[in-house]
């Protein structure tokens, strides 16, 4: 039974993209939320259609840092500086109770928290973001070009960055700018999305 192995998921009868929380809901109030349930291949299809692309992992991390170096988060090293939540993650007892101290239990509108030094919102928390690269060893574990390093040329998994609203220090504290996870590129989830990059 999936509910026993992943107790933070729940079945919602009648849910679909037009009614994400069930038959009495709609997407009207979600227009400023990140797009979710996106597999890597979905993100690639959108990029081809729009003339944009997914960022490479190194580009994503550079953008996430917002001009800071050697910091855990886009704003510094404190998770909640001066008691102010800076990203959408799980608060409370994971997975039993989300106290919503940051104001959200699921995705949050993209401008709910302050932007980083480059003016980018939600580089950590809210939804995991696909990047272009195949998953492989960390760049610092092998010799890569100093400028524009790319991941392996092949593999079975792609990389997601940034963490999500389901991340909690007791379970998944991968909401730091340097954290990453391997993911099957055919999988999607309610906490997976993407952002695009462009070339000048």
PLM segments and residue spans:
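C-terminal/domain-terminus segments
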Residues: 181-189
């Amino acid at each position: 039974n999936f509910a026993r192995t992943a107790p933070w998921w729940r079945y919602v009868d009648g849910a679909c993209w037009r009614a994400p929380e069930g038959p009495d809901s709609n997407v009207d109030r979600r227009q400023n939320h990140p797009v979710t349930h996106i597999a890597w291949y979905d993100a690639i299809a959108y990029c081809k259609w729009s003339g944009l692309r997914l960022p490479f992992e190194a580009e994503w991390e550079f953008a996430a840092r917002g001009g800071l170096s050697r910091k855990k988060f886009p704003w510094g090293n404190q998770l909640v500086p001066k008691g102010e939540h800076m990203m959408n993650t799980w608060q409370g007892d994971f997975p039993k109770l989300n106290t919503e101290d940051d104001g959200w239990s699921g995705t949050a509108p993209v401008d709910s928290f302050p932007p980083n030094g480059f003016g980018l919102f939600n580089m950590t928390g809210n939804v995991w973001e696909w990047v272009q690269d195949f998953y492989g060893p960390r760049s610092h574990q092998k010799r890569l070009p100093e400028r524009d390093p790319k991941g392996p040329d092949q593999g079975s998994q792609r990389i997601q960055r940034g963490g999500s609203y389901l991340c909690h220090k007791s379970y998944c504290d991968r909401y730091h700018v340097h954290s990453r996870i391997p993911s099957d590129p055919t999988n999607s989830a309610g906490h997976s999305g993407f952002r695009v990059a462009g070339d000048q």
